[in-house]
């Protein structure tokens, strides 16, 4: 099997069809104001520690919190927050406030066991994304190895937006939400 990274690069895209299955390198989420990402680890079947990775743009000027606790954003060219399956809560909410733009979610893996390095968007990393409800998605992920079975990490995401008249509502990740 060819690395997913090679297939994504050869086709100049972040979404590919391979053996009749659609694979995503990452999943874009349009943000306009404040949203809540409800994340849930469902299953892990890898010899490597797995992570849900939230990638922020280099010009991110909003704020991120988990359970009302502010999360400092790394001061790097490509800031990312790694939520490791063995240390993050099984279910948690990530609040993103005061930001308009695109964030990305993908999977990652720790190839050396230190959590100081997270392989994502490279080698075998890819995801099968399925809609399982209004604003709710299942991600079946492959780690950085060649196998391509996308069973190394399974997680779910629900995207909610606070509205003036309806309270919290589930929303589509690829539309601007006002």
Can you describe what each PLM-predicted range is?
Residues 118-178:
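Acidic, proline/glycine-rich low-complexity IDRs
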């Amino acid at each position: 099997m060819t690395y997913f990274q090679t297939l994504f690069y050869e086709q100049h895209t972040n979404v590919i069809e391979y053996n009749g299955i659609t694979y995503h390198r990452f999943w874009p989420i349009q943000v306009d104001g404040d949203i809540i990402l409800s994340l849930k680890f469902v299953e892990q079947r890898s010899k490597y520690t797995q992570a849900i990775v939230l990638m922020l743009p280099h010009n991110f000027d909003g704020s991120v919190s988990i359970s009302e606790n502010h999360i400092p954003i790394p001061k790097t060219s490509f800031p990312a927050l790694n939520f490791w399956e063995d240390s993050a809560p099984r279910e948690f909410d990530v609040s993103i406030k005061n930001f308009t733009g695109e964030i990305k979610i993908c999977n990652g893996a720790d190839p050396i066991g230190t959590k100081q390095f997270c392989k994502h968007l490279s080698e075998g990393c890819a995801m099968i994304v399925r809609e399982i409800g209004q604003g709710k998605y299942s991600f079946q992920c492959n780690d950085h190895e060649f196998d391509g079975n996308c069973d190394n990490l399974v997680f779910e995401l629900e995207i909610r937006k606070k509205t003036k008249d309806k309270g919290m509502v589930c929303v589509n990740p690829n539309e601007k939400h006002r």
